[in-house]
């Protein structure tokens, strides 16, 4: 079985290369091999490779910068997943996609459920929700993971930053108005790879 992995160089993508390998031939692409802003090239790549599974770990993740680059964020987070989903539906394949807790408004005091209403408050959140909506509208077989506070051995993340600051400073000043669920990139990758055995 062939598995197309997009976003191979990120925290989750790096782990996915390892967890997906036992499940088939992994064709791993980074930004240089697959630019998600070029939707025609993206479509051509999928048509050429005809994978049984596409794992989209690629995204525009600069939450604050998305406010000044809304078109670019929408292209990568909203439109590219839609193109992938259309091609997956055409192939009868499976799409595994990663979204975010930013699709919610952050007002709830308990953990969010998948069934809770979405209400993104940022450009980033709106673009990620647009990607989810495009996937669902395509009718493609898909799994969407809403992740938050991802950490891993590779790349920068909140956990690494706090550990570094704890070594460097006597006292830390950290915001107290944010709630999240730190999620291991390795756990995300292992959970994702299990879907290649039994598609939904």
Predicted regions and their residues:
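N-terminal Rossmann NAD(P)H-binding glycine-rich loop of SDR-like oxidoreductase domains
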Residues: 2-20
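SDR active-site strand-loop-helix element
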Residues: 6, 29, 54-58, 95-100, ...
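Rossmann-fold NAD(P)-dependent oxidoreductase module
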Residues: 15, 19, 87, 134
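Hydrophobic "lid"/C-terminal helical patch
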Residues: 16, 46, 192-196
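Adenosine-cofactor binding site in Rossmann-like domains, unifying the SAM/SAH pocket
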Residues: 21-44
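NAD(P)H-binding glycine-rich loop region in Rossmannoid oxidoreductase-like domains
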Residues: 39-78
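Catalytic helix-loop patch of NAD(P)-dependent Rossmann-fold dehydrogenases
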Residues: 68, 75, 80-83, 90, ...
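NAD(P)-dependent short-chain dehydrogenase/reductase
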Residues: 133-194
């Amino acid at each position: 079985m062939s598995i197309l992995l997009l976003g191979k160089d990120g925290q989750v993508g790096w782990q996915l290369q390892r967890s997906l390998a036992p499940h088939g031939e992994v064709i791993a692409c980074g930004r240089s091999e697959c630019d998600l802003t070029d939707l025609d090239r993206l479509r051509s790549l999928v048509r050429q490779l005809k994978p049984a599974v596409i794992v989209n770990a690629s995204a525009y993740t600069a939450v604050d910068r998305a406010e000044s680059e809304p078109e670019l964020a929408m292209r990568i987070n909203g439109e590219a997943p839609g193109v992938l989903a259309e091609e997956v539906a055409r192939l009868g394949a499976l799409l595994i996609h990663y979204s975010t807790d930013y699709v919610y408004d952050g007002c709830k005091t308990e953990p969010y459920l998948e069934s809770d209403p979405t209400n993104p408050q940022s450009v980033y959140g709106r673009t990620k929700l647009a990607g989810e909506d495009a996937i669902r509208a395509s009718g493609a077989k898909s799994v969407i993971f809403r992740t938050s506070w991802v950490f891993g051995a590779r790349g920068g993340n909140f956990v690494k930053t706090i550990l570094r600051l704890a070594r460097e400073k006597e006292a830390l000043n950290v915001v107290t108005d944010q709630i999240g669920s730190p999620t291991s990139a390795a756990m995300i990758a292992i959970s994702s790879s299990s879907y290649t055995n039994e598609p939904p």
